[in-house]
Amino acid sequence: FLAVDCSPAGDIYGDQGAIGEGTLIRFFDPGHLMLPNMKDFLLTTAEEAGIKYQYYCGKGGTDAGAAHLKNGGVPSTTIGVCARYIHSHQTLYAMDDFLQAQAFLQALVKKLDRSTVDLIKNY
């Protein structure tokens, strides 16, 4: 399961999540901890596809937190974009980050097959 979401930018305060630094790969949030093989799959795919990315550990949750509990466990992750003023009527993000996230999702879907899912689940 690939959740697509915006996460709050913390770059003004020197925290993680910088606008303009690429798509987000969320390894952890209070409702979800990524499987180690999912992490490997994401990082390998990003490197192979030349995707600009940044690590992110969120304080809020995403749909990946609910999805990974369904049907005996669904491998899940969140791919996102850093933004300011999320949950408001005026969200601000970098278009290049959005395009990197879009390209990353396309690369992931092209590589994702049954054997890859089985490998991800084998922790």
Residue ranges and their predicted role:
Residues 1-26, 60, 116, 120:
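Acidic/histidine-rich catalytic neighborhood of metal-dependent amide-processing enzymes
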Residues 24-102, 107-123:
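Active-site-adjacent substrate-binding region
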